[in-house]
Amino acid sequence: MPYRIRPDRPLLGEVRSVARRELERAIETLETRPEGLHEAIHAARKNFKRLRNLYRLVLTNDKDFRRTENARLRNAGRSLSHIRDATALIETAEHLAEHALTGDEAETVAAAREMLALRRDEIAEAEGDLQAKVTSVIEECRAGIDALAALSLPSKPNHAARLVAKGWRKGLEEARSALEISKGEGHGEAFHDLRKAAQAYWMNLLLLLDLWPSAFEAKRQDAKRLVDLLGHEHDLTVLTTLLDHEPDVFGNAEGVSFLLAIIIRRQQELRRDALALADRVFADTAKDEAAIIEALWMRYAGDRR
């Protein structure tokens, strides 16, 4: 079943169904590992991100439940993140290689990739308690499923519409704020916040795709493109931080400086493209979009009653 909630059905049942499905998929993937343990961890963390986004959208009025379950999901994801984060840096080097301008740049990036791969392997060997962490996360997923019994949401369509619109508006306000800060100060944390807001918007468009399939699918494609640009940008920020904290991983100082110059150039390109696209993705005001969501929800619910 898709990551979707239908306005013509009780909101509580829809949210519980999606939440249970994400947690059950995470459990199944971590237990069966069809593509290996590390891919299973990567997939489970995606389940957690989707569920955290769902709670962020619909639980603006139930802060206690949201706070508790958000902490559960955040901690579960973090406990499994070490090796995945190290693997992501290898993928970042591969992205840089695709944008190398000279042979010297290509050689420098290739050498960095080899060193990052060695670092990832060392981390994997050192993380001897990974299986215990996976077992603990599976237990937390089951506890998260049990917690759904305590979830409370409005049953009337107009109240549900207002609640979802409130969450939608809050997300877009955060996106606009992050966008303006990114344009002004341009620091890595602002772009990271913009990425998180864009990712939430992309997932929300999927959640409510039934409201207006053609328009939401077009917006979702633009949002996904923005998420990808900002994802690469953030990965380069993480790689820069590693260069600062563990320069020995990358060899001599001259090589580190050359690699940093390559990173900065690509990061500037990504930021320029992302800001231009973000202006289009978040062109409408949060208030106007929220009003549209509320109206579409009521129309959809009314047409199918």
Report residues per predicted region.
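Function-determining surface determinants
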Residues: M1-R305
